[in-house]
Protein backbone atom coordinates (compact mmCIF):
# COMPACT_ATOMS: atom_id res chain seq x y z
CA UNK A 1 0.00 0.00 0.00
CA UNK A 2 1.42 3.36 -1.02
CA UNK A 3 1.86 6.03 1.60
CA UNK A 4 -0.47 8.98 1.32
CA UNK A 5 1.32 12.12 0.24
CA UNK A 6 0.88 13.45 3.77
CA UNK A 7 3.12 10.69 5.11
CA UNK A 8 5.38 10.19 2.09
CA UNK A 9 9.08 10.98 2.10
CA UNK A 10 9.96 14.62 1.72
CA UNK A 11 10.13 15.91 -1.83
CA UNK A 12 10.22 19.51 -2.94
CA UNK A 13 6.97 20.72 -4.46
CA UNK A 14 6.45 23.62 -6.84
CA UNK A 15 3.87 25.22 -9.05
CA UNK A 16 4.16 24.03 -12.64
CA UNK A 17 4.93 27.13 -14.68
CA UNK A 18 2.42 29.84 -13.86
CA UNK A 19 -0.42 27.37 -13.37
CA UNK A 20 -2.10 26.37 -10.12
CA UNK A 21 -0.86 22.79 -10.48
CA UNK A 22 1.27 21.85 -7.48
CA UNK A 23 3.67 19.12 -8.53
CA UNK A 24 6.59 17.16 -7.12
CA UNK A 25 10.13 17.79 -8.35
CA UNK A 26 10.10 14.32 -9.89
CA UNK A 27 7.42 13.09 -12.27
CA UNK A 28 6.78 9.39 -12.90
CA UNK A 29 7.14 8.46 -16.58
CA UNK A 30 5.01 5.63 -17.94
CA UNK A 31 5.95 4.99 -21.56
CA UNK A 32 7.02 1.36 -20.99
CA UNK A 33 3.72 0.29 -19.41
CA UNK A 34 2.01 -2.11 -21.79
CA UNK A 35 5.17 -3.24 -23.59
CA UNK A 36 8.01 -3.78 -21.12
CA UNK A 37 5.83 -3.50 -18.00
CA UNK A 38 2.42 -4.94 -17.16
CA UNK A 39 -0.32 -3.83 -14.75
CA UNK A 40 1.34 -5.42 -11.73
CA UNK A 41 4.63 -3.67 -12.53
CA UNK A 42 2.87 -0.33 -13.01
CA UNK A 43 0.99 -0.64 -9.72
CA UNK A 44 4.26 -1.27 -7.90
CA UNK A 45 5.95 1.67 -9.64
CA UNK A 46 3.14 4.06 -8.73
CA UNK A 47 3.14 2.89 -5.12
CA UNK A 48 6.92 3.27 -4.87
CA UNK A 49 6.85 6.71 -6.49
CA UNK A 50 4.16 7.86 -4.07
CA UNK A 51 6.24 6.58 -1.17
CA UNK A 52 9.03 8.84 -2.43
CA UNK A 53 6.63 11.80 -2.44
CA UNK A 54 5.87 11.86 -6.16
CA UNK A 55 2.39 13.20 -6.95
CA UNK A 56 2.87 13.77 -10.70
CA UNK A 57 2.42 11.10 -13.41
CA UNK A 58 2.94 11.63 -17.14
CA UNK A 59 1.48 9.50 -19.91
CA UNK A 60 0.22 9.86 -23.50
CA UNK A 61 -2.54 8.55 -25.74
CA UNK A 62 0.02 6.91 -28.06
CA UNK A 63 1.89 5.11 -25.26
CA UNK A 64 3.41 2.58 -24.83
CA UNK A 65 6.49 2.86 -26.97
CA UNK A 66 8.16 1.68 -29.07
CA UNK A 67 5.12 1.53 -31.33
CA UNK A 68 6.71 -1.26 -33.39
CA UNK A 69 6.73 -3.64 -30.40
CA UNK A 70 4.61 -6.79 -30.80
CA UNK A 71 2.48 -5.92 -27.78
CA UNK A 72 1.87 -2.29 -28.75
CA UNK A 73 -1.68 -0.98 -28.65
CA UNK A 74 -2.57 2.71 -28.65
CA UNK A 75 -3.93 3.85 -25.30
CA UNK A 76 -2.76 0.79 -23.37
CA UNK A 77 -0.67 2.84 -20.95
CA UNK A 78 -3.56 5.16 -20.13
CA UNK A 79 -5.73 2.09 -19.49
CA UNK A 80 -3.16 0.69 -17.07
CA UNK A 81 -3.00 4.00 -15.18
CA UNK A 82 -6.80 4.24 -15.28
CA UNK A 83 -7.12 0.79 -13.75
CA UNK A 84 -4.88 1.88 -10.87
CA UNK A 85 -6.88 5.08 -10.35
CA UNK A 86 -10.14 3.13 -10.40
CA UNK A 87 -8.87 0.84 -7.63
CA UNK A 88 -7.35 3.71 -5.61
CA UNK A 89 -10.07 6.35 -5.81
CA UNK A 90 -8.75 8.25 -2.79
CA UNK A 91 -5.47 8.75 -4.61
CA UNK A 92 -7.00 10.64 -7.52
CA UNK A 93 -7.20 13.98 -5.72
CA UNK A 94 -3.62 13.58 -4.47
CA UNK A 95 -2.22 12.95 -7.93
CA UNK A 96 -1.59 15.30 -10.85
CA UNK A 97 -2.24 13.36 -14.06
CA UNK A 98 -0.73 14.55 -17.33
CA UNK A 99 -1.33 13.05 -20.75
CA UNK A 100 -0.59 14.03 -24.33
CA UNK A 101 -2.53 14.45 -27.58
CA UNK A 102 -0.62 13.12 -30.59
CA UNK A 103 0.59 15.68 -33.12
CA UNK A 104 0.53 15.30 -36.89
CA UNK A 105 0.65 11.63 -37.88
CA UNK A 106 -1.02 10.42 -41.08
CA UNK A 107 -3.30 7.36 -41.07
CA UNK A 108 -2.67 6.68 -37.42
CA UNK A 109 -3.85 3.82 -35.23
CA UNK A 110 -3.67 6.33 -32.37
CA UNK A 111 -6.43 8.45 -33.90
CA UNK A 112 -8.41 5.31 -34.77
CA UNK A 113 -8.29 4.17 -31.12
CA UNK A 114 -10.21 7.25 -29.96
CA UNK A 115 -13.45 5.44 -30.80
CA UNK A 116 -14.84 2.01 -29.91
CA UNK A 117 -14.57 0.08 -32.14
CA UNK A 118 -11.55 1.78 -33.70
CA UNK A 119 -12.27 3.99 -36.69
CA UNK A 120 -11.55 2.37 -40.07
CA UNK A 121 -9.80 3.40 -42.18
CA UNK A 122 -7.49 5.03 -39.66
CA UNK A 123 -7.71 8.83 -39.77
CA UNK A 124 -4.83 11.26 -39.45
CA UNK A 125 -3.76 12.59 -36.07
CA UNK A 126 -4.11 16.37 -36.28
CA UNK A 127 -4.46 19.20 -33.77
CA UNK A 128 -7.68 20.66 -35.14
CA UNK A 129 -10.40 21.41 -32.58
CA UNK A 130 -12.45 18.27 -33.19
CA UNK A 131 -9.42 15.98 -32.96
CA UNK A 132 -8.08 17.56 -29.77
CA UNK A 133 -11.47 17.26 -28.08
CA UNK A 134 -11.93 13.67 -29.26
CA UNK A 135 -8.46 12.77 -27.99
CA UNK A 136 -9.17 14.32 -24.59
CA UNK A 137 -12.49 12.47 -24.26
CA UNK A 138 -10.83 9.17 -25.17
CA UNK A 139 -8.08 9.76 -22.61
CA UNK A 140 -10.66 10.53 -19.93
CA UNK A 141 -12.41 7.23 -20.67
CA UNK A 142 -9.20 5.22 -20.54
CA UNK A 143 -7.95 6.99 -17.42
CA UNK A 144 -11.35 6.53 -15.73
CA UNK A 145 -11.35 10.09 -14.46
CA UNK A 146 -13.40 13.23 -14.99
CA UNK A 147 -10.47 15.52 -15.73
CA UNK A 148 -6.92 15.58 -17.00
CA UNK A 149 -4.82 17.91 -14.88
CA UNK A 150 -2.34 18.70 -17.67
CA UNK A 151 -3.16 18.07 -21.34
CA UNK A 152 -0.07 18.37 -23.53
CA UNK A 153 0.40 18.46 -27.30
CA UNK A 154 2.88 15.62 -27.90
CA UNK A 155 4.42 17.43 -30.87
CA UNK A 156 3.21 20.23 -33.14
CA UNK A 157 0.75 19.91 -35.98
CA UNK A 158 3.07 21.92 -38.19
CA UNK A 159 6.27 20.39 -39.50
CA UNK A 160 9.25 20.61 -37.15
CA UNK A 161 12.37 18.39 -36.95
CA UNK A 162 11.60 15.69 -34.37
CA UNK A 163 13.21 12.84 -32.41
CA UNK A 164 16.74 13.02 -33.70
CA UNK A 165 16.19 15.13 -36.82
CA UNK A 166 18.25 18.30 -36.51
CA UNK A 167 17.72 20.42 -39.63
CA UNK A 168 14.55 22.31 -40.52
CA UNK A 169 13.51 21.65 -44.11
CA UNK A 170 11.90 24.69 -45.71
CA UNK A 171 8.40 24.02 -47.06
CA UNK A 172 8.48 20.32 -46.25
CA UNK A 173 4.78 20.54 -45.36
CA UNK A 174 2.56 23.61 -45.11
CA UNK A 175 -0.96 22.30 -44.38
CA UNK A 176 -0.76 23.03 -40.66
CA UNK A 177 -3.72 23.59 -38.34
CA UNK A 178 -3.57 27.17 -37.02
CA UNK A 179 -2.29 27.38 -33.45
CA UNK A 180 -5.24 29.66 -32.69
CA UNK A 181 -7.71 26.85 -33.47
CA UNK A 182 -5.92 24.43 -31.16
CA UNK A 183 -5.70 27.09 -28.42
CA UNK A 184 -9.44 27.71 -28.63
CA UNK A 185 -10.11 23.98 -28.30
CA UNK A 186 -7.95 23.81 -25.17
CA UNK A 187 -9.80 26.82 -23.75
CA UNK A 188 -13.11 25.05 -24.39
CA UNK A 189 -11.87 21.92 -22.62
CA UNK A 190 -10.75 23.99 -19.64
CA UNK A 191 -14.10 25.81 -19.53
CA UNK A 192 -15.85 22.42 -19.54
CA UNK A 193 -13.75 21.28 -16.56
CA UNK A 194 -12.11 18.49 -18.56
CA UNK A 195 -8.57 19.88 -18.18
CA UNK A 196 -6.96 22.15 -15.61
CA UNK A 197 -3.96 23.34 -17.62
CA UNK A 198 -2.20 22.57 -20.88
CA UNK A 199 1.33 22.20 -22.12
CA UNK A 200 3.52 21.89 -25.18
CA UNK A 201 5.99 19.16 -26.06
CA UNK A 202 8.84 18.84 -28.54
CA UNK A 203 8.37 22.51 -29.39
CA UNK A 204 10.68 25.18 -30.76
CA UNK A 205 11.29 28.80 -29.69
CA UNK A 206 9.12 29.93 -32.60
CA UNK A 207 6.31 27.66 -31.44
CA UNK A 208 6.55 28.81 -27.82
CA UNK A 209 6.34 32.46 -28.88
CA UNK A 210 3.38 31.82 -31.18
CA UNK A 211 1.57 29.85 -28.50
CA UNK A 212 2.12 32.61 -25.95
CA UNK A 213 0.77 35.15 -28.42
CA UNK A 214 -2.32 33.05 -29.18
CA UNK A 215 -3.05 32.39 -25.52
CA UNK A 216 -2.67 36.04 -24.59
CA UNK A 217 -5.22 36.95 -27.26
CA UNK A 218 -7.64 34.42 -25.74
CA UNK A 219 -6.86 35.40 -22.15
CA UNK A 220 -5.62 31.89 -21.35
CA UNK A 221 -1.87 32.48 -21.03
CA UNK A 222 -1.91 31.40 -17.36
CA UNK A 223 -3.10 27.97 -18.51
CA UNK A 224 0.04 27.37 -20.61
CA UNK A 225 1.95 25.59 -17.89
CA UNK A 226 4.76 23.56 -19.38
CA UNK A 227 6.90 22.28 -22.21
CA UNK A 228 8.12 18.69 -22.39
CA UNK A 229 11.34 18.55 -24.41
CA UNK A 230 14.46 16.42 -24.43
CA UNK A 231 17.15 17.63 -22.03
CA UNK A 232 20.22 15.82 -20.72
CA UNK A 233 23.99 15.97 -20.54
CA UNK A 234 24.10 14.96 -24.22
CA UNK A 235 21.26 17.25 -25.34
CA UNK A 236 21.47 20.73 -23.80
CA UNK A 237 19.77 22.60 -26.65
CA UNK A 238 17.19 23.96 -24.21
CA UNK A 239 19.91 26.02 -22.49
CA UNK A 240 19.80 28.77 -25.11
CA UNK A 241 16.83 29.87 -27.20
CA UNK A 242 14.15 27.73 -25.57
CA UNK A 243 15.19 28.76 -22.07
CA UNK A 244 14.80 32.41 -23.07
CA UNK A 245 11.48 31.85 -24.85
CA UNK A 246 9.95 30.00 -21.89
CA UNK A 247 11.25 32.57 -19.41
CA UNK A 248 9.96 35.57 -21.35
CA UNK A 249 6.65 33.95 -22.26
CA UNK A 250 5.38 33.91 -18.70
CA UNK A 251 7.66 31.36 -17.08
CA UNK A 252 6.74 28.08 -18.78
CA UNK A 253 8.04 25.10 -16.79
CA UNK A 254 10.23 22.41 -18.36
CA UNK A 255 9.39 18.71 -18.08
CA UNK A 256 12.63 17.19 -19.41
CA UNK A 257 12.36 13.76 -20.97
CA UNK A 258 15.18 11.23 -21.41
CA UNK A 259 17.40 12.86 -18.80
CA UNK A 260 19.45 9.64 -18.95
CA UNK A 261 19.67 9.66 -22.74
CA UNK A 262 17.43 6.63 -23.04
CA UNK A 263 19.57 4.88 -20.40
CA UNK A 264 22.92 5.52 -22.10
CA UNK A 265 23.97 7.98 -19.37
CA UNK A 266 23.19 5.46 -16.63
CA UNK A 267 26.36 3.58 -17.53
CA UNK A 268 24.57 0.25 -17.79
CA UNK A 269 25.55 -0.19 -21.44
CA UNK A 270 29.27 0.07 -20.66
CA UNK A 271 31.24 -3.16 -20.45
CA UNK A 272 30.11 -4.78 -17.22
CA UNK A 273 27.49 -2.08 -16.68
CA UNK A 274 24.66 -4.47 -15.92
CA UNK A 275 22.46 -4.22 -19.02
CA UNK A 276 20.20 -7.27 -19.31
CA UNK A 277 18.12 -8.90 -22.02
CA UNK A 278 15.19 -6.73 -20.94
CA UNK A 279 17.11 -3.43 -21.14
CA UNK A 280 15.66 -1.09 -23.76
CA UNK A 281 18.50 -1.07 -26.26
CA UNK A 282 19.07 -4.82 -25.92
CA UNK A 283 15.39 -5.68 -26.31
CA UNK A 284 14.77 -3.09 -29.04
CA UNK A 285 18.03 -2.56 -30.93
CA UNK A 286 18.18 0.67 -32.93
CA UNK A 287 15.24 2.20 -31.02
CA UNK A 288 16.14 5.82 -30.19
CA UNK A 289 19.06 5.36 -32.55
CA UNK A 290 20.82 8.55 -31.45
CA UNK A 291 21.37 7.01 -27.99
CA UNK A 292 21.42 3.29 -28.75
CA UNK A 293 24.98 1.97 -28.23
CA UNK A 294 24.86 0.14 -31.59
CA UNK A 295 23.85 3.20 -33.61
CA UNK A 296 24.82 6.33 -31.62
CA UNK A 297 27.57 8.50 -33.03
CA UNK A 298 31.14 8.00 -31.79
CA UNK A 299 30.91 11.52 -30.29
CA UNK A 300 27.81 10.57 -28.27
CA UNK A 301 29.40 7.39 -26.98
CA UNK A 302 32.63 9.21 -26.10
CA UNK A 303 30.79 11.96 -24.25
CA UNK A 304 28.72 9.41 -22.34
CA UNK A 305 31.89 7.59 -21.31
CA UNK A 306 33.45 10.87 -20.18
CA UNK A 307 30.43 11.64 -18.00
CA UNK A 308 30.47 8.12 -16.54
CA UNK A 309 34.16 8.48 -15.65
CA UNK A 310 33.52 11.88 -14.10
CA UNK A 311 30.82 10.33 -11.91
CA UNK A 312 33.29 7.70 -10.74
CA UNK A 313 35.88 10.38 -9.98
CA UNK A 314 33.50 12.34 -7.76
CA UNK A 315 32.14 9.25 -6.00
CA UNK A 316 28.64 9.00 -7.41
CA UNK A 317 26.84 6.92 -10.00
CA UNK A 318 26.50 8.01 -13.63
CA UNK A 319 22.71 8.17 -13.27
CA UNK A 320 22.91 10.31 -10.12
CA UNK A 321 25.29 12.73 -11.84
CA UNK A 322 23.07 13.02 -14.92
CA UNK A 323 19.92 13.59 -12.88
CA UNK A 324 21.61 16.00 -10.45
CA UNK A 325 22.84 18.13 -13.33
CA UNK A 326 19.32 18.50 -14.72
CA UNK A 327 17.95 19.29 -11.26
CA UNK A 328 20.40 22.18 -10.82
CA UNK A 329 19.16 24.05 -13.89
CA UNK A 330 17.32 27.25 -13.00
CA UNK A 331 14.59 26.59 -15.55
CA UNK A 332 13.61 23.50 -13.55
CA UNK A 333 12.46 25.69 -10.65
CA UNK A 334 8.97 25.71 -12.18
CA UNK A 335 9.23 22.28 -13.79
CA UNK A 336 9.60 18.60 -12.91
CA UNK A 337 12.08 15.90 -13.93
CA UNK A 338 10.47 12.93 -15.67
CA UNK A 339 11.88 9.70 -14.22
CA UNK A 340 10.92 6.31 -15.59
CA UNK A 341 12.22 2.78 -15.21
CA UNK A 342 11.41 -0.80 -16.09
CA UNK A 343 12.24 -2.28 -12.67
CA UNK A 344 11.68 -1.15 -9.10
CA UNK A 345 15.32 -1.13 -8.03
CA UNK A 346 16.16 1.21 -10.90
CA UNK A 347 13.21 3.48 -10.11
CA UNK A 348 14.04 3.53 -6.40
CA UNK A 349 17.66 4.47 -7.12
CA UNK A 350 16.66 7.24 -9.52
CA UNK A 351 14.11 8.75 -7.12
CA UNK A 352 16.20 8.48 -3.95
CA UNK A 353 18.28 11.66 -4.54
CA UNK A 354 15.13 13.80 -4.77
CA UNK A 355 14.75 13.60 -1.00
CA UNK A 356 17.56 16.16 -0.72
CA UNK A 357 18.35 19.36 -2.66
CA UNK A 358 20.48 18.82 -5.75
CA UNK A 359 24.08 19.89 -5.14
CA UNK A 360 26.99 19.87 -7.56
CA UNK A 361 30.01 21.90 -6.55
CA UNK A 362 31.65 24.37 -8.90
CA UNK A 363 34.47 21.98 -9.81
CA UNK A 364 32.03 19.29 -10.92
CA UNK A 365 29.95 21.77 -12.91
CA UNK A 366 33.14 23.06 -14.55
CA UNK A 367 34.14 19.51 -15.46
CA UNK A 368 30.69 18.90 -16.97
CA UNK A 369 30.96 22.08 -19.01
CA UNK A 370 34.43 21.08 -20.20
CA UNK A 371 33.06 17.80 -21.56
CA UNK A 372 30.14 19.68 -23.11
CA UNK A 373 32.48 22.11 -24.87
CA UNK A 374 34.50 19.23 -26.31
CA UNK A 375 31.37 17.47 -27.52
CA UNK A 376 28.45 19.89 -27.66
CA UNK A 377 25.07 18.13 -27.88
CA UNK A 378 26.58 15.15 -29.71
CA UNK A 379 23.29 13.26 -30.05
CA UNK A 380 21.77 16.21 -31.94
CA UNK A 381 24.31 16.46 -34.75
CA UNK A 382 23.89 15.59 -38.41
Regions found by a protein language model. Give the residues of each.
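N-terminal binding-site loop/beta-alpha segment at the start of enzyme catalytic domains
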Residues: 2-100, 130, 146, 277
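Glycine-rich, aromatic-flanked loop segments that form ligand/cofactor-binding clefts
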Residues: 89-110, 251-263
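N-terminal small/glycine-rich loop or linker at the start of catalytic domains
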Residues: 17-36, 98-123, 152-167
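Active-site gating/metal-coordination segments in enzymes
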Residues: 108-152, 160, 230, 234
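Short, acidic/polar
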Residues: 37-50, 128-142, 183-184, 208-212
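Structural preference for beta-strand elements that scaffold enzyme active sites
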Residues: 15, 23-27, 55-56, 94-100, ...
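Non-catalytic positions within long, well-ordered alpha-helices that form the structural scaffold/packing
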Residues: 50, 141-144, 191, 247
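Beta/alpha (TIM)-barrel catalytic core signal, keyed to glycine-rich beta->alpha loops juxtaposed to Asp/Glu
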Residues: 35, 65, 70, 156-375, ...
